[in-house]
Amino acid sequence: MFAAPPVIETRVFSRMPDRFRKPNKRSEWTDIMLLGGTADCFLEGPSFDAAGNLWLVDIPFGRIFHVSPDGEWTCAADYDGEPNGLKLHADGRIFIADHKQGILQLDLATGAVSPALDRPRLERFKGCNDLFFAADGTLYFTDQGQTGLHDASGRLYRLRTDSGLDRVLEGIPSPNGLVTNLDEKILYLAVTRDNAVWRVPMLPGGEATKVGVFVQMSGGLAGPDGMALDVAGNLAVAHAGLGTVWLFSPLGEPIARVRSCAGVMTTNVAYGGSDNKSLYITESESGSILVAEMPEPGRKMYG
């Protein structure tokens, strides 16, 4: 066990404007994920573009937003889907992990959303959750669906640059956020319902080996969700249901606790700002984007 780490406070960077909220509206997603409850939005998938705009998704209502550096919100797409994760490719294309429709791509010129990978080998995914680009353009993504300790059948995939698809891992109880370490030899995988972050060593050919637990977490109403790495190799882990983002060293030691100033549903994170030391956090209970100043800059992501 470790002593409690120092606390880093947050502030609200921006809140979804009321004109975009859908109060008391139900969807298929809210019926299952919120046990019949309602939500006027549920934010996830933060990712910055080259101009400093923060892109993010609204899962239950199939919307993609971008927020300017001064906090102005724009709805870039509204479609029949459940977008859960979002990442930018180096060429500026936007890829979406959609719980309902698979891996999608957003056309920035038209706002159209189209399939990039929806039925590999004629089979649907369980429900894609999050995604990550390696330096060479390889796309890793998680297929979570409704898996958990009762149904440990979630999967981790790799989409190679030659369009070949590999199943890297299966038998995972709720795979969620993912990111590699600095040299990309280790993949960190948030396993939400196990309340743990797994360490997945990757062989030169891309196969996983000797998978183990990197950090065993506790508490909260959900578990580890989105993650990001800084230039020192420290791992920021959004702990959904605890109102916290944990910062762990490359050895798994807790360095800091970033505390939400809003609700407890801290779902995902992205580094940004002029010096890339600002950690932006989607807080889905209040529909807000929080920000905290971190000790190290975030690693520049692919794209």
Locations of the language-model features?
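Sequence/structural signature of beta-propeller modules
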Residues: M1-E28, V291-G303
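Short loop/turn segments that connect beta-strands within beta-propeller blades
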Residues: V67-E72, D107-G111, L159-S163, P201-G206, ...
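A short loop-to-beta-strand structural motif that recurs across blades of beta-propeller domains
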Residues: R63-F65, G102-L104, R155-Y157, A196-W198, ...
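Beta-rich, blade/repeat-based domains predominating
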Residues: M33-A51, Y79-G102, R121-L139, Q146-T147, ...
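Beta-strand-rich domains and repeat architectures in extracellular enzymes and scaffolds
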Residues: V12-R63
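Short, solvent-exposed loop/turn segments at conserved positions within beta-propeller repeat blades
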Residues: I59-P60, H99, T147-G154, T192-N195, ...
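Loop/turn-rich, solvent-exposed surfaces of beta-rich toroidal or solenoidal domains
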Residues: N195-A196, V200, A208-V211, V215-E253
